[in-house]
Amino acid sequence: VKALFFDRFGGPEVLRYGALPDQALDAGSVLVETSAVGLNFADIYRRQGVYLLEGKAPWIGGYEGVGRIVAVGTGVDRWRIGQRVGFLDVPRAHAARVCAPADRLVALPDDVDDRTAAALLLQGVTAQYLVEDSGRLAAGDQVLVQAASGGVGRLLTQMAAALGAEVHALASTPSKREQARSNGASAVYGYDDWVAQVRRATGDGVDVVYDSIGTTLHDSLAALRPGGRVVIFGKAGGTPPAIDPLSLMEQSKGVVGGDLWTYLNRAESRQSRADRLFAALRAGMITAPVITTFPLSEGAVAHRLLEDRNFAGKIVLIPDGLR
């Protein structure tokens, strides 16, 4: 199978494109011929060796994609050859063919094209669980979204605003702050003295802070009102600092960890979350990102672009020959 792979950790230069042995089709799995696969920051962290990878080199990155089923393993009843499917938690996705456990596939609506689905599934369902499960947002809540112009942050802002929450957004540049405002943020801030600005704007702080940076955990807690909570779901800036539990007790503040795989644990859950995500897109509650495509063989170029913090939008890799 043609794939984008690496056999050592490092920068984009370690990525190679070529043929690797086909993966065996296990019982309970299907073989998907991909038409579009998403590129996410987690793929960069895996390439760098920051995130743990199973098995031995060579490793194929990617977790999210869209395609059609070309083979069905024994014990699979729900899916058939030729069916169009998506997935958001299937490893080794950056390849022309992917072996996927049958319970990790989702059926896709006809009105959402392959590239949009591949661009939206993982980040969209992530934002969805952060709003519904970890944050448990309600209309009238005041929330702060860090990195609000990023892939998840953009959707978080849109979903929270559609729910009726008052969204305060952090973004690093004037253009990104303008993007956050256009996505529904009521107030936007840069990263200079943002805690004081948020507290002045809200009176005594926000109800929920979505922290994807990690190193900002102490500041996130300081931006909360008494009884508020930080949902920490990333460490883009580095490892979060230690916190004293007694400091949380004094104002009844809390820190909630956010990890998608806690909630994405059943086939029915995957499908219902995907259905609700695409319904939100159809209703205009959220919008698809600006999509930049590269051939799978140019994956190293795509990785370099994604690592550029000035990049906005979503990168989708297209198997060679399908552009």
Where are these regions (language model features)?
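Adenosine-nucleotide cofactor-binding segment
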Residues: V145, A161-T216
